């Protein structure tokens, strides 16, 4: 995940193992059938922080590939026919002027005030963007102790929607919130575009090919010990476990 702490536990720990196993299985099949070709396994780091595959693609890593196949863990067996969101990842760094918060606050220019005002502006902006737009933020540096006017503050933003054009529009408006906050607080702001990607397009032919292949693969079976372990996990997490287990292959959606 390349996230601090636990992260968000969406199963990225399974990616490398399954991809390596799939590559070995495909190699064995190619050797058995006499098929020609080269298989490569890529590790794509920092997906959650900077959309690692986008950076790798921009640097030409995948230029000579005929096809690239990816997968993601899920809570059931399915083939995705979804359109995944276009996204901008940005860092906003506000620069102010440090001063003692009790002795001479009037001499300070709070970078943290600017960051907070930016976030207030973005939260008011939510009413005026399309319903599929998402704008998430976190503080990644808020400067000095409370008795010092902070001269630096940093926020990290993820801005998403299902269309690149909407993402770009929302992203520019978030930038304007940052610029306005800097103007109000007599600070400055640096805007860093960490990564940017367009929405994922659906290829119906490949989707159906995947689905047909998955119908030929036996679905997993679990031992009583494994089911008991799963129940313990859900209880520890405070989740509801009604004892049922999804099995089989989820039907393919007609439309993305």
Which role does the model predict for each range below?
Residues 16-21, 25, 56, 210:
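Cytochrome P450 catalytic-core helices
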Residues 21-36:
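Flexible, small-residue-rich helix->loop connector segments that border functional cores
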Residues 17, 51-52, 102, 165, ...:
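Residues that form or flank phosphate/diphosphate-binding pockets in enzymes
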Residues 7-8, 23:
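Internal helix-loop-helix
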């Amino acid at each position: 995940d390349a996230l601090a702490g636990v992260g968000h536990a969406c199963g990225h720990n399974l990616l490398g193992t399954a991809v390596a196993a799939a590559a070995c299985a495909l190699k064995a099949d190619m050797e058995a059938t006499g098929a020609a070709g080269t298989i490569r396994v890529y590790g794509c780091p920092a997906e959650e922080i900077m959309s690692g595959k986008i950076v790798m693609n921009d640097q030409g890593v995948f230029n000579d590939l005929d096809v690239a196949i990816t997968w993601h863990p899920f809570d059931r067996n399915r083939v995705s026919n979804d359109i995944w969101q276009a996204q901008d990842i940005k860092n906003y760094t506000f620069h102010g002027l440090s001063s003692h918060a009790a002795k001479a606050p009037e001499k300070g220019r709070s970078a943290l005030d600017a960051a907070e005002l930016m976030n207030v502006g973005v939260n008011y902006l939510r009413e005026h963007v399309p319903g599929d737009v998402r704008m998430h933020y976190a503080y990644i540096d808020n400067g000095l102790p409370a008795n010092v006017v902070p001269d630096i503050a940093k926020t990290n933003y993820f801005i998403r929607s299902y269309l690149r054009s909407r993402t770009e529009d929302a992203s520019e408006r978030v930038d304007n919130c940052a610029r306005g906050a800097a103007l109000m607080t007599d600070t400055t702001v640096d805007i860093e575009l960490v990564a940017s990607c367009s929405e994922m397009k659906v290829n119906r032919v490949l989707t159906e090919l995947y689905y047909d292949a998955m119908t030929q693969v036996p679905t997993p079976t679990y031992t009583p010990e494994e089911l008991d372990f799963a129940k313990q996990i859900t209880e520890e997490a405070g989740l509801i476990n009604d004892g049922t287990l999804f099995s089989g292959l989820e039907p393919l959606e007609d439309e993305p």
